[in-house]
Regions:
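Long, low-complexity, charged/polar intrinsically disordered regions in eukaryotic proteins
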Residues: 1-34
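Long, charge-rich, low-complexity alpha-helical segments
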Residues: 34-99
Length: 99
């Protein structure tokens, strides 16, 4: 378990099926399933959102991000992913399931 309560290696994360993704120019937004919240995604969150098209573990996300940006320290990659996933989970934009 990490500091956010996710098992990085075994918990799969996926998009909530009713969450809507919108791109407006260079900006990316999520519209909450209840339609009452809109959140702007930073580039890292948008990239992770795209990776969650199918259920995926944080570990698998970190492997992909690390391969794309090998200069980044692995601990920083994992920390950033954990933070984004925690926020998206707490806001109800994504769901978790066991591997």
């Amino acid at each position: 378990m990490n500091a956010f309560g996710l098992d990085f290696e075994t918990t799969k994360v996926s998009r909530h099926p009713k969450t809507q993704f919108r791109e407006v120019g260079d900006e990316m937004f999520l519209v909450h399933p209840d339609g009452e919240q809109i959140h702007n995604l930073n580039p890292m969150a948008a990239a992770l959102w795209r990776l969650m098209e199918e259920p995926i573990t944080g570990q698998d996300m970190a492997d992909i991000v690390q391969a794309a940006f090998p200069i980044m320290a692995r601990t920083k990659v994992e920390s950033d992913i954990n933070q984004v996933l925690s926020q998206l989970l707490n806001l109800g934009f994504v769901e978790t399931s066991a591997k």
